[in-house]
């Protein structure tokens, strides 16, 4: 436990605390998705006025172009699916039971990795991925036209700023989830029309500024320079 005293203030204040956890129990995928819990309590005059609980899963991982994914130093073959947040009759407005059922079906299939496409999904889904040890690719809704000829990038200041803001919000909101191992920056963009390459580079730089610990990735359906901007 650590205490920090913050003076009353009208502006946002940032505080950092560090501690050492000897011999930590690692979050180890579906084999052992162990998590600690961090609790931040705001006290005033000895009374609790607010409290935030965040997951804390400790793990390390690497990727290799030839050998694949390694979790906590051990090779982990990834058996994954791509999931849209949508059910019949409710559309995108899912209840917790829908997320739970999707997770149950994935575990029944032997899934240990997921791409949550093509947008940030419900906070509860990330919690389920943490608890069940499923390696997760989370991404922003920067999506090309798929099989159509039209462009997916509109080179306007408002478009650019909106995408960057969504990226920052995604990373900051979900940074503490141990299941998230990749930040996805785009899906199947085309280079015809407004060329997105320079903007993707800006997003890639921003992602690493916000989170130097996780690699970036993308999904592409064409060849060329667009495939060599993100880390994976």
Model-derived regions: residue spans:
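Active-site-adjacent beta->alpha loops and helix N-cap segments on the catalytic face
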Residues: 122-125
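Aromatic- and acidic-residue-enriched carbohydrate-binding clefts of CAZyme catalytic domains
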Residues: 79-84, 92, 137-175, 182-184
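Active-site neighborhood of glycoside hydrolase catalytic domains
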Residues: 131, 156-230
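Short, small-residue-enriched loops and turns at beta-alpha junctions
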Residues: 88-90, 144, 189-192
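Short amphipathic alpha-helical patches
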Residues: 80, 105, 129-130, 149-153, ...
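Secreted/periplasmic carbohydrate-active enzymes, especially glycoside hydrolases
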Residues: 1-118, 128, 132-136, 166, ...
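Phenylalanine-focused residue identity feature
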Residues: 19, 34, 61, 69-70, ...
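Active-site beta-loop-alpha junctions enriched in small/polar residues
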Residues: 83, 119, 141-143, 186-188, ...
């Amino acid at each position: 436990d650590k205490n920090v005293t913050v003076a009353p203030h009208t502006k946002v204040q940032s505080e950092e605390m560090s501690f050492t956890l000897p011999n930590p129990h690692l979050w180890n995928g579906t084999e052992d998705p162990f998590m600690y819990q961090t609790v931040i309590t705001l006290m005033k005059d000895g009374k609790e006025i607010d409290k935030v609980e965040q997951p804390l899963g400790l793990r390390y991982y690497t990727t290799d172009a030839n050998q694949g994914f390694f979790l906590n130093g051990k090779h982990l073959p990834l058996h994954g699916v791509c999931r849209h947040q949508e059910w019949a009759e409710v559309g995108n407005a899912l209840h917790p039971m829908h997320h739970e059922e999707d997770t149950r079906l994935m575990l029944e299939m032997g899934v240990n990795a997921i791409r949550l496409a093509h947008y940030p999904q419900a906070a509860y889904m990330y919690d389920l991925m943490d608890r069940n040890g499923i390696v997760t690719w989370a991404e922003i809704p920067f999506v090309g036209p798929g099989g159509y000829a039209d462009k997916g990038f509109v080179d306007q200041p408002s478009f650019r700023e909106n995408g960057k803001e969504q990226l920052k919000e995604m990373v900051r909101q979900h940074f503490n989830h141990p299941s998230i191992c990749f930040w996805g920056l785009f899906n199947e963009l085309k280079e015809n029309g407004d060329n997105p390459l320079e903007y993707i580079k800006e997003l890639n730089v921003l992602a690493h500024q916000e989170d130097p610990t996780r690699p970036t990735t993308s999904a592409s359906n064409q060849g060329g320079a667009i495939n060599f901007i993100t880390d994976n």
